[in-house]
A protein has these predicted regions:
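Metal-associated gating/positioning segment near the N- to mid-region
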Residues: 57-123, 141-148, 212, 236, ...
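His/Asp/Glu-enriched, well-ordered alpha-helical/loop segment
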Residues: 83, 223, 288-293, 299-384
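Divalent metal-dependent hydrolysis catalytic cores, especially in the metallo-beta-lactamase
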Residues: 91-117, 128-137, 163, 186-199, ...
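Histidine/acidic residue-rich metal-binding segments in metalloenzymes
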Residues: 173-270, 286-287, 298-318
Length: 420
């Protein structure tokens, strides 16, 4: 792809992703990187440099979704089983386009997406968010992501055909599976150490894998420089994940003092995926939308999340935004930020959770904030998310989307004038 042309964005309000707010700033970029941030009054017009006037808008870093399953949109097993793979891939690509159009410039896919769509974005064939992939969820037999039912029929709806099956048992198989996923292109490793809301066999807090198995996965991933994300709602499975040294904990269930102390001490990221339960509870109004066992678990777990979130937040656990939303309507992923605020974060904290803190969770040190040297991932929104966080979930109010210095959405029109 050609190198992005230089550009300057005039900002009504600039939120840098690190907790700072500045009025009437200007952000300059070239070669896909931010080169300068200064007051608009100090900017001099340079020939050949495009200027975008977002002087009435709020500019902030591109948003992250640290936990999604882009290959598993909310369609029934029956419908998915009758869908040609090529059509399914095109639907996934459309979901990715929609996410970028609504301000999400980076997504960490926690199982299902294959290497092809990631490369399509990198090569410019698909206008989607930057993607980090785990390919599959490492799971034990009869565990969270074992899609084989009691009669041997696969109910797999998560993975694209190019993503491996992550079922394995024992230390040696766990180590081998980690290596296979890395060989297949995984940016990070995802392991399930407890059951989940969608588990057919296990409960939400059922321990999955032994400590030795989890340690084998983490050690092997570290040898290849890959972080490990653990699906872990609580109990002994969560403790095993933390003892093994995972980089992040996905989802949120009951937390005790030991869990929180380990997360704070080790710097473990928590990706609570509050929206996942919210969406499931909303789907309860649609007959047959979800299995009864899944709805029962969601209803039991939902009231526990508020207390757990409050304790983790107050203790200083690093919380990153992720939805586990599986292809919501455009703008829907940003509802996670509204829930973070509802559960106790300030709007600025929620924005950091979806920008700079999320970048840390994704191990992308050169993204997530608006500073010289960082990747030029920015969005502009019509409104003030510090006053009304829900504005980020309104697709019609996302006026500008820039990823790596390239403009993928611009409803502003016109250039800024009045430069010195």
């Amino acid at each position: 792809m050609e190198t992005p042309a230089p550009m300057v964005i005039r900002c009504g309000t600039l939120l840098d992703g690190l907790g700072r707010s500045e009025r009437n700033a200007a952000v300059s970029m070239a070669g896909g990187r931010i080169t300068d941030v200064r007051p608009w009054a100090e900017v001099s017009r340079q020939p050949g440099i495009r200027v975008v006037d977002a002087g009435r808008l709020t500019v902030l870093p591109g948003l992250f979704d640290c936990h999604d399953h882009l290959a598993a949109p909310p369609r029934s097993l029956l419908e998915r089983s009758g869908t040609p793979p090529s059509l399914h891939v095109l639907r996934v690509a459309e979901t990715m386009r929609g996410m970028l159009q609504t301000g999400f410039t980076t997504v960490r896919d926690a199982g299902g997406l294959d290497l092809g769509l990631k490369l399509a974005v990198e090569e410019g064939l698909l206008a989607g968010p930057r993607v980090l992939i785990s390919l599959a969820i490492i799971t034990q037999t009869a565990g969270l992501a074992d899609a084989t039912n009691a009669v041997g029929f696969s109910t797999e709806v998560l993975r694209l055909p190019g993503a491996p099956d992550g079922v394995c048992d024992g230390v040696d198989q766990a180590r081998l599976m980690t290596r296979r996923l890395i060989r297949a292109g995984a940016d990070f490793i995802k392991i399930a150490t407890t059951g989940g809301v969608s588990s057919r066999v296990s409960g939400v807090l059922t321990r999955e894998f032994s400590l030795d198995e989890v340690q084998a996965v983490v050690a092997e991933a570290r040898a290849f420089g890959r972080p490990v994300a653990a699906h872990a709602y609580g109990g002994e499975g969560l403790k095993n994940a933390l003892r093994a040294g995972v980089s992040s904990v996905e989802h949120l269930g009951p937390l005790d003092d030991e869990d929180i102390e380990m997360m704070v001490r080790q710097g473990t990221y928590l990706v609570p995926t509050l929206l996942n339960l919210q969406v499931r509870l909303e789907m309860a109004q649609e007959p047959g939308a979800l299995p009864a066992y899944s709805m029962e678990k969601a209803e039991e777990l939902a009231p526990l999340q508020q207390a757990a979130f409050t304790r983790a937040h107050r203790a200083g656990v690093r919380i990153a935004a992720g939805t586990d939303s599986r292809g919501l309507r455009p703008g829907g992923n940003a509802r996670e930020l509204s829930l973070l605020v509802k559960y106790g974060m300030s709007p600025m904290e929620a924005i950091r959770a979806a920008t700079s803190t999320a970048a840390g969770c994704c191990h992308l040190a050169d993204t997530g904030s608006i500073e010289p040297g960082k990747r030029a991932d920015l969005i502009a929104v019509d409104g003030d998310p510090l006053d009304e966080i829900d504005v980020l979930a309104d697709a019609t109010r996302i006026a500008l989307v820039v990823r790596a210095g390239r403009t993928f959405r611009n409803t502003i029109g016109g250039e800024a004038g009045g430069q010195g």
